């Protein structure tokens, strides 16, 4: 008993529980239990334990807790066990993540899709310079995300692929809204510039605004607000005054003074109103010129209600312009017959005047006044008959006056100057500025007049002087010898020589006649020259030029003849001058012949009282 009562055996007392915790082989038995089972206070050793036993389990508990926590973490990471109520305490390792997420919740993010905007607008928005400008202006960061996709590519889009869009991120909603509004303004300007007469293919850019880490559900309500603002409805109203009068400025009437009418519609409805088409002055960016369509008003608005209101105001404006044009046309119709101006032709009508007028879109209710053709000036009929008279030009007062615009009559060929038609035998002695002989009568005078206009065509100048036999002619020499007018030239020497031979016999006859009659008559001399002209038909062209010059010399002869006096010297001089005047020309009247020829002619001319 003593043994059992005096000394305790180790088998008599239970083993300390701490020994099981220190053994690593016992740990798998704890796995089916919860993670906090081995941390519960009931597992503590009993109070009867010694101090040594208490100190040993305290160090073992810390080690066991660390190992258990590591194992539990590994199991939860693999998903074999689910976290319990103690899990928030266990996830204290990424404890700073919630604070970081909370700071990110303050950033507002918006996405503006620009995949379907016009090319020029898309290129402008994707430029870094434009995005930097938007960032400086709004305070939000703008970047390009996604890639451009066509309609076919968008239909086959993958889960991780998105169309081209702009990523806007800011600290507050106001900064993001400011950047988005700027982007919308750029897109609106690009759409308006690229709009054409056909229906637009741009459906608008979608804008998505959300908080980055937040779920999609709370962000859905503001999304339609931004998306609806970018969907533009468009319409156009044709003016309908393509064939208006050129003096009626349709563009100015529609736009108003300084585009005030269209600006008023924009302020009232908030729509974009522009004038486009032919004559609008709006240059299309694609073609670089005006559209081929007739003039129309282009209307664009984000909402259909605003578009309808703007369209109604534009219709009222066009009605006012049409009524004003009708008043303008009526005013022209009432004033045109009074002033006598011709109006432009109707639509599809052939103009009655050679002037071109643009086709008009109205019907003129009055007869078109055609300007009368200018009446031709009254032509004074006159007939140029064969004149019989002096070749001297008539007085200016005698020539019949005619109207200035009268054109020459092609049926009556005339020559200018037209000689004065006078009765036979009439003369104009008042026009004699030189000692000419009075005009002869009859056939000889007619031949002179008809050939007078041809003198200017046959005049020739030479430095040679033909030899002549009548060297006894005396008179005044007109001008130098080398510039003397020789008429038709040297072929005339044959006639001159023949006439000179005949003049010798005539001088003898006249000398015999002078003894009986004093003074000798001058007319028989000219009468005797007519047979001489007829006797030389081979020189018809030569004889046509001489009669005028013979008349000049004859005039000089009568001017030198003295009718009173009985001096034989005067008779001799008279005979010499008479023979020279009847045969010589005006160009050799004063030529001095050699002394040998003068002596030969002086022999038959001695006075009658010295005759043997």
From Swiss-Prot:
Gene Ontology MF annotations: RNA binding
UniProt superkingdom: Eukaryota
One Pfam family of this chain: KH-I_KHDC4-BBP
Annotated GO CC locations: cytoplasm; nucleus
Annotated keywords: Cytoplasm, mRNA processing, mRNA splicing, Nucleus, Phosphoprotein, RNA-binding
KW Ribosomal protein (keyword) present: no
Segments for region (Disordered): 510-542, 565-612
CDD domains found in the cross-reference section: KH-I_KHDC4_rpt1, KH-I_KHDC4_rpt2
Span list, region Required for nuclear retention: 477-545
GO BP: mRNA splice site recognition
UniProt cross-references to InterPro entries, sorted A to Z: KH_1_KHDC4/BBP-like, KH_dom_type_1_sf, KHDC4_KH-I_first, KHDC4_KH-I_second, PRP5/DDX46/KHDC4_KH, RIK/BLOM7
Subcellular location: Nucleus; Cytoplasm
Entry annotated with the keyword Cytoplasm: yes
Domain KH positions: 105-185, 237-319
Domain notes: The C-terminal part is necessary for the interaction with the PRP19C/Prp19 complex/NTC/Nineteen complex. The KH domains mediate RNA-binding.
Subunit note: Interacts with PRPF19.
Function: RNA-binding protein involved in pre-mRNA splicing. Interacts with the PRP19C/Prp19 complex/NTC/Nineteen complex which is part of the spliceosome. Involved in regulating splice site selection. Binds preferentially RNA with A/C rich sequences and poly-C stretches.
Protein family according to the UniProt entry: Belongs to the KHDC4 family.
Record protein name field: KH homology domain-containing protein 4
Native organism: Xenopus tropicalis (Western clawed frog)
Species classification: Eukaryota, Metazoa, Chordata, Craniata, Vertebrata
């Amino acid at each position: 008993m003593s043994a059992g009562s005096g000394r305790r055996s180790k088998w008599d007392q239970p083993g300390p529980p701490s020994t099981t915790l220190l053994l690593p082989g016992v740990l798998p038995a704890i796995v089916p239990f919860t993670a906090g089972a081995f941390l519960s206070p009931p597992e503590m050793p009993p109070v009867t334990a010694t101090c040594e036993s208490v100190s040993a389990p305290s160090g073992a508990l810390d080690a066991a807790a660390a190992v258990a926590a590591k194992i539990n973490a590994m199991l939860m990471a693999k998903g074999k066990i689910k976290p319990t109520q103690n899990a928030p305490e266990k996830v204290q390792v990424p404890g700073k993540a919630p604070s970081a997420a909370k700071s990110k919740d303050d950033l507002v993010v918006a996405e503006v899709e620009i995949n379907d905007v016009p090319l020029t607008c898309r290129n402008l928005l994707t430029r870094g310079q434009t995005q930097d400008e938007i960032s400086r202006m709004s305070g939000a960061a703008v970047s390009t995300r996604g890639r451009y996709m066509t309609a076919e590519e968008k239909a086959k889009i993958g889960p991780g692929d998105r169309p081209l869009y702009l990523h806007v991120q800011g600290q507050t909603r106001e900064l993001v809204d400011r950047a988005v509004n700027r982007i919308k303004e750029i897109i609106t300007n690009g759409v308006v510039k690229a709009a054409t007469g056909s229906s637009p293919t741009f459906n608008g850019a979608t804008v998505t605004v959300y908080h980055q880490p937040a779920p999609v559900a709370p962000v859905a309500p503001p999304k339609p607000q931004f998306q609806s603002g970018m969907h533009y409805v468009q319409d156009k109203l044709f003016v309908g005054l393509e064939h208006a009068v050129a003096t009626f400025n349709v563009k100015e009437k529609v736009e108003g003074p300084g585009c005030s009418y269209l600006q008023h519609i924009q302020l009232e409805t908030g729509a974009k109103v522009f004038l486009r088409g032919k004559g609008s002055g709006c240059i299309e960016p694609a073609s670089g010129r005006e559209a081929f369509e007739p003039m129309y008003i282009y209307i664009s608005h984000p909402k259909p209600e605003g578009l309808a209101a703007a369209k109604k105001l534009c219709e009222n404006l066009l009605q006012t312009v049409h009524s004003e044009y009708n008043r303008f046309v009526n005013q022209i119709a009432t004033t045109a017959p009074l002033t006598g101006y011709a109006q432009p032709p109707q639509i599809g009508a052939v103009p009655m005047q050679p002037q071109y007028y643009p086709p008009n879109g109205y019907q003129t209710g009055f007869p078109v006044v055609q300007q009368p053709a200018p009446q031709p000036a009254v032509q004074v009929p006159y007939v140029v008959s064969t004149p019989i008279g002096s070749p001297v030009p008539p007085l200016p007062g005698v020539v019949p006056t005619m109207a200035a615009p009268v054109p020459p009559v092609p049926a009556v060929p005339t020559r200018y100057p037209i000689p004065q038609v006078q009765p036979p035998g009439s003369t104009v002695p008042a026009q004699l500025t030189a000692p000419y002989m009075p005009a002869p009568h009859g056939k000889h005078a007619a031949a002179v007049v008809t050939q007078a206009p041809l003198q200017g065509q046959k005049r020739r100048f030479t430095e040679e002087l033909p030899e002549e036999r009548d060297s006894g002619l005396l008179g005044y020499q007109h001008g130098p010898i080398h510039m003397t007018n020789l008429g038709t030239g040297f072929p005339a020497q044959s006639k001159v020589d023949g006439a000179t031979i005949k003049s010798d016999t005539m001088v003898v006859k006249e000398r015999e006649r002078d003894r009986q009659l004093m003074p000798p008559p001058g007319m028989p001399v000219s009468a005797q020259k007519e047979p001489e002209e007829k006797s030389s038909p081979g020189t018809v062209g030569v004889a046509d030029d001489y009669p005028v010059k013979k008349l000049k010399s004859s005039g000089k002869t009568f001017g030198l003849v003295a009718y009173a006096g009985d001096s034989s010297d005067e008779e001799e001089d008279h005979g010499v001058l008479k023979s020279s005047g009847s045969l010589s020309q005006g160009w050799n009247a004063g030529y001095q012949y050699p002394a040998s020829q003068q002596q030969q002619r002086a022999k038959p001319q001695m006075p009658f009282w010295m005759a043997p």
